[in-house]
């Protein structure tokens, strides 16, 4: 912990030297940390958290951590700790209900063996200006389906939380048949995406589907973009079919826009959306090209990875310990103050509206600016607007929304039989909207 605090002070000094400081680095005491059953990082020196099934070896980190119970491919959790030292870290697994409250199942009901894994795979960064330790661990196999939380903590003290990360294990007991349709709303026809679907369950019995079945539809792997309160419009028990067709926009998502992108896979030249690179003895810094609002602009198709990011270097194939951490500068030209707060969001920061993701207004340039520390790679991002007095952000404010946007949707089906203590995951389906392969 002492080494960590020393590094934080040094890093804050680098932030001051390199320009605007928009956030402070904090290390909470163990007694001040509260377990969050969502993707969350409790200390700012821990960064670049990835959880994925190792399926092919080629950009596996883009794989969704939703896996079948019978899958042989391991789930991999990896992350970095900034600084020259390392910590003794442990992993445990928590089973959750469909609403992500902690279930009443005991550990022995969902896990074989002791629920504490020491993370012994740790490597120091090689040749980087900002040092870090890379951690990697294979998650233990679970015995039952459901929502799960991977929890990392320090030195066998479960209250000294480091990070939490969600994953799901399912059994394909039902078939999900989705169908994208034009929105039934006249005003939403060109801005929203409507998803009807049917659930077929020929090989199982479902009792009281309206009360026992829960479906979650998730946009672009985001837990802050879900619909989870749908009930079947028709229940056809004779053919074991649930029909989810609606006419009051219950199953409509704003299409949003394609994600903005940038690449720091090299600091030897200006890569995608990079305006300027500055190399100093102790750090490297990049400045993204100035962004503007794309609201009220016509839809334009360009490739993205649905909000995700990939750690990568052009000069080497080693992703874990050779990419450096780079001060990355975002600038949004709003032509003046806006009536609220401005954030940059993406999978790289769990779409968190936090001080670390907030852009501050710079009266000298009449723009909103943010400097943050990110590992080299290829990133997707958006700008989110938080109106004064609101707790709900609005990405359409800066990005616009189009029915033609290419998005990925997950359908997750839960079932709690009568008398059961928790929810089973009995089906999963992922689809790409508007033509992305």
Residue map of PLM features:
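Bacterial Sec-dependent N-terminal signal peptides
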Residues: 1-33
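Low-complexity, Pro/Ser/Thr- and charge-rich linker/hinge segments at domain boundaries
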Residues: 34-41, 169-192, 402-427
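Contiguous beta-strand segments within globular domains
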Residues: 42-93, 188-199, 315-330
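Aromatic-rich carbohydrate-binding modules that target alpha-glucans
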Residues: 110-135, 223-230, 329-376, 388-417
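Ligand-binding face of N-terminal immunoglobulin V-set domains in extracellular IgSF glycoproteins
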Residues: 129-155
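Short acidic/polar inter-strand loop motif in beta-rich domains
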Residues: 143, 154-162, 266-272, 386-401
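Long, internal scaffold/assembly segments composed of regular secondary structure
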Residues: 209-297
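Basic K/R-rich, polyanion-interacting modules in nucleoproteins and related proteins
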Residues: 287-338, 425-434
């Amino acid at each position: 912990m002492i080494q960590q605090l020393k590094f934080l002070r040094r890093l804050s000094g680098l932030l001051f030297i390199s320009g605007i400081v928009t956030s402070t680095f904090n290390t909470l005491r163990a007694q001040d940390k509260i377990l969050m059953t969502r993707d969350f990082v409790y200390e700012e020196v821990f960064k670049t958290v990835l959880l994925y099934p190792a399926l092919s070896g080629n950009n596996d980190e883009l794989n969704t951590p939703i896996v079948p119970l019978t899958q042989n491919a391991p789930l991999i959790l990896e992350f970095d700790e900034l600084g020259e030292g390392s910590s003794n870290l442990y992993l445990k697994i928590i089973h959750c209900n469909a609403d992500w409250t902690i279930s009443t199942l005991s550990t022995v009901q969902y896990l074989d063996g002791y629920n504490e894994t020491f993370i012994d795979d740790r490597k120091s960064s090689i040749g980087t200006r900002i040092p870090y330790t890379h951690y990697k661990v294979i998650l233990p196999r679970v015995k039952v389906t459901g929502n799960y939380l991977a929890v990392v903590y320090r030195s066998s003290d479960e209250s000294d939380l480091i990070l939490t990360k969600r994953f799901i294990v399912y059994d394909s007991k039902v078939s999900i048949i989705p169908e994208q349709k034009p929105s039934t709303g006249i005003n939403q026809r060109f801005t929203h995406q409507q998803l009807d679907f049917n659930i077929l369950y020929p090989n199982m019995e479902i009792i009281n589907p309206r009360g026992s079945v829960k479906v979650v539809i998730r946009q672009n792997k985001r837990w802050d973009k879900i619909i989870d309160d749908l009930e079947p419009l028709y229940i056809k028990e004779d053919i074991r079919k649930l029909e989810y067709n609606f006419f009051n926009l219950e199953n409509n998502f704003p299409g949003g826009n394609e994600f903005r992108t940038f690449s720091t896979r090299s600091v030897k030249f200006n890569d995608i959306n990079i305006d300027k690179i500055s190399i100093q003895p102790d750090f490297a810094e990049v400045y993204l090209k100035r962004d503007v609002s794309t609201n009220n602009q016509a839809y334009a198709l360009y490739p993205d990875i649905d909000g995700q990011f990939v750690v990568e270097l052009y000069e080497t194939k080693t992703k874990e310990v050779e990419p450096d951490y780079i001060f990355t500068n975002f600038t949004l030209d709003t032509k003046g103050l806006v009536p609220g707060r401005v954030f940059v969001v993406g999978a790289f920061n769990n779409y968190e509206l936090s001080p670390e993701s907030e852009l501050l207004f710079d009266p000298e340039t009449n723009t909103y600016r943010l400097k943050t520390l990110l590992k080299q790679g290829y990133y997707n991002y958006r700008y989110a607007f938080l109106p004064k007095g609101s707790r709900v952000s609005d990405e359409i404010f800066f990005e616009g929304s189009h029915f033609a946007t290419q998005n990925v949707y997950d359908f997750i089906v839960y079932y709690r039989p009568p008398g059961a203590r928790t929810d089973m995951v009995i089906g999963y389906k992922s689809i790409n909207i508007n033509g992305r392969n």
